[in-house]
């Protein structure tokens, strides 16, 4: 199709949309003249007033994880300088405390992982009848001995799992079971004493006096 024919057809139809115009290889001059503006919108110049880009509002300009480029200015993580590591030779020597209370959470050999022989060497649990004869101070002390021993067993179990030792699990679980039986007995005795105190308080409010029976 000739260019003049396309222009005449477009003027008669009041202007055809781009989808109805012929393809570029049939009318290249017409196609490019309709798409591109014949007038240049801005003057090209390499001088400083015209070629300046102005203020860059993008804060991430120049940051690329692929090319390992960072921002244009330094970023501080803190207003205080980072501490410098000290060599082990410059550190002050500390003498260990042989009788420190935290050693009670470890076996006698002071190792994080107890041996199966150590966990297996234990006695039976306290019976309820034996605990009934104990005072409040004795029960309180025995309870915290059980708590500390169970803490030590839990530490050994965690270390055994971390090292994947593959032994000592049965002995430690059996020792922990015996300790839990003792703790349940202590709670049972304290519960009995609480009920006895409530009953005695109720009888006293009702007017009962033991000396009146004599």
From Swiss-Prot:
The keyword Mitochondrion applies. Keywords: Mitochondrion, Ribonucleoprotein, Ribosomal protein, Transit peptide. One of its GO terms (molecular function) is structural constituent of ribosome. It comes from Aspergillus terreus (strain NIH 2624 / FGSC A1156). It comes from the Eukaryota. Component of the mitochondrial large ribosomal subunit. Mature mitochondrial ribosomes consist of a small (37S) and a large (54S) subunit. The 37S subunit contains at least 33 different proteins and 1 molecule of RNA (15S). The 54S subunit contains at least 45 different proteins and 1 molecule of RNA (21S). Gene3D superfamilies: 6.10.330.20. This is Large ribosomal subunit protein uL29m. InterPro entries: MRP-L47_sf, Ribosomal_uL29_mit. GO terms for cellular component: mitochondrial large ribosomal subunit.
